[in-house]
Amino acid sequence: MADEEKLPPGWEKRMSRPSGRGYYFNHITNPSQWERPSGNSSSGGKIWQGEPARVRRSHLLVKPVKAALDLAAGNHPDQGGGPGADQRLHPEDQGRREGL
């Protein structure tokens, strides 16, 4: 079976969280693809389109980025907000907070 054969250098098999499908990722050059890479090309097949873009986004580290932005804006997690915290609310959320 092809999955049991050794992958080319730099490639590893991963599982898509949303779909549960296996995909291949090259941690040296960073392409991701559904098809198993062959040993004779750097990309090894078709690069993701459509649904796989969601897979890539699902691996973003959203919480650390948000925490860094909050700290840069003067909001410290243990202080419950900082200067202008209400100004960054979505307009609908800000209206709810003001009782509108």
UniProtKB/Swiss-Prot annotation:
SUPFAM superfamilies: WW domain
Superkingdom in the source lineage: Eukaryota
Region annotation Disordered: where it falls in the sequence: 1-52, 69-100
Composition bias type Basic and acidic residues, residue spans: 1-15, 87-100
Alphabetized Gene3D superfamilies for the sequence: 2.20.70.10
Record's compositionally biased regions (Polar residues): 27-44
Pfam families assigned to the protein according to its UniProt record, in alphabetical order: WW (PF00397)
Coiled coil stretches, renumbered: none
Domain WW: 5-38
Protein name per UniProt: Putative PIN1-like protein
Native source species: Homo sapiens (Human)
